[in-house]
Amino acid sequence: MKRTYQPSKIKHQRRHGFRARMATANGRKVLARRRAKGRQSLTV
């Protein structure tokens, strides 16, 4: 049986990247929360 996490940089960026966050209202809320918290990196 293979492991469940088979990392792919492209899929990771498309789902969790900055442009993916900016594409939806809720994604922008995520970025706003992370900015307010003072996160060094907003997205992966």
From Swiss-Prot:
Belongs to the bacterial ribosomal protein bL34 family. It comes from Acholeplasma laidlawii (strain PG-8A). Residues 1-44 are annotated as: Disordered. GO terms for molecular function: structural constituent of ribosome. This is Large ribosomal subunit protein bL34. InterPro entries: Ribosomal_bL34, Ribosomal_bL34_CS. The lineage of its organism: Bacteria, Bacillati, Mycoplasmatota, Mollicutes, Acholeplasmatales. The keyword Membrane does not apply. Keywords: Ribonucleoprotein, Ribosomal protein. It comes from the Bacteria. GO terms for cellular component: ribonucleoprotein complex; ribosome. The keyword Ribonucleoprotein applies. Pfam families: Ribosomal_L34. Residues 1-19 have a biased composition (Basic residues). Transmembrane segments: none annotated. GO terms for biological process: translation.
